Amino acid sequence: MKILLVACNAKYIHSNLAVYDLQAYASDYADHIVLKEYTINQQKDDIMRDIYLEHPDVVCVSCYIWNLSFVKELMADLIKILPGADFWAGGPEVSYDAEKFLIENSEFKGVMVGEGEETFKELAGHYVEKNPQNLKNMTGICYRDGDQIIHNGWRQIMDLSSIPFIYKDLSEFKNRIIYYESSRGCPFSCSYCLSSIDKKLRFRDTETVKKELQFFIDNKVPQVKFVDRTFNCKHDHAMAIWKYINEHDNGVTNFHFEISADLLREEELQEMSTMRPGLIQLEIGVQSTNPDTIKAIHRTMDFEKLKGIVDRIHSFGNIHQHLDLIAGLPYEDYDSFRHSFNDVYALKPQQLQLGFLKVLKGSHMMEMCREYGIVYKTQEPYEVLSTKWLDYDHVLKLKTVENMVEVYYNSGQFQNTLEYLEKFFPDVFSIYERLGSFYMEKGYGDVSHTRMRRYEILLEFLEDVPEISMDQVKDQMVYDLYLRENLKSRPGFARDQKPFERQIWDFRKREKVAKNAHVEVFADGTVLLFNYADRDPLTNNAHVTDVTKDVFENLNRD
């Protein structure tokens, strides 16, 4: 008997923690279980061949919002070449409408609904021990029995600490993100999120968590990403883990947490302030700053408190902050979203994620679609097309804003240029709004561009902005360019450095400046030294020193 666990991830760097948990929990049947991971970017024929050559008796596949269509197409063909195999689905994308899924996908024997560890273990036992009566008494499944579809109900939640640690051999996770779960469920009721359905919040034993994190620390894993929905919802749990990783820091490993910033306490902030730059990074969901929207989505957030805490963390200078907004929420029209964007942008996060509402199966938001006039895509990821407050024209405009934010803000490559531009626009949202429109008007939106071409397009756009000094813009761009790297070829818009060649050479020789460092003379006479051997651990920007006095003294002597 061979049972194949299949995961189809969005990217190669991702790994599927869920299927590894299933495999580990069903270790009694380890000799019969094989795990295979693929990506949705692979050719289906290649995956189909690989699965076929395993000659499985049972195929269990995890289904998510990013892979469902891919999985259904793949399994529909696999059943033709593996007619004797049983196919099972599991995961959030099939748990909430299991009967409908089985009616529409006749190749599947059944669906594991909800938490899968105990269910999969029993299911594996059913096949290995060849006991046909097991399915009738097994909770956590919906299955096909002849012409009938039988739903046995959801299983009671399990003890999270009973799941074995899956990371025994890190070689199979090389160059991939390590995911870790220290809690399951969520105490909040955000209407767009499936985590809000699972109110039974539970935690992995803290001492067990420490031992497992030490394994990552000892092995100098580059990054560990916690999948906990609100990591800091229980103060003692979060504080113990943050304190532990701070005290056992190896100087390499980064830990990623999704948190609610307004829940942070002084003790936690004090601990964060002492951390190595880059030890942790925080993802903070703001979603909207419109009070009516926050109330409608059943979200709990004190934005003024959140703002103060984000500012405070920013002042530490050691923690990457990633803030999220969602377009398409109830009561959020275009102008309201502009306001939310400006509010969050002012907090200066390292990343500002502009996402769009996805109407998930089983969520309260799906139940409210008619009342809110929400229209969304038929196929996953079920993304919003329009609402009572936001028409499709404005959704399209926000899509271009999202793209511009990703290219110009989140890349971190235009930071000083963007800050300089703020005073020439009514608000920061207008920068990205107008730049996005410019891209579309010029036909630049559907073309891939080099980093340097992005600078040139920005310059072209700014030529029609009143009162702006193009010379100063160009200097800001040159500054941003050299912050990241010592350019092999200077852009055409950069200031000519030939008049200063001898003075810069003398300065470099006198001060024994490293060969890979760069010295730049700007239009206002400022001379800056970019040291690439000394980089900011958060931004990776070169350390910059003002050497104007040293170079100009040399100029004056000459």
Describe every region a protein language model picked out.
Residues 2-6, 44, 51, 57, ...:
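Radical SAM enzyme core and accessory elements
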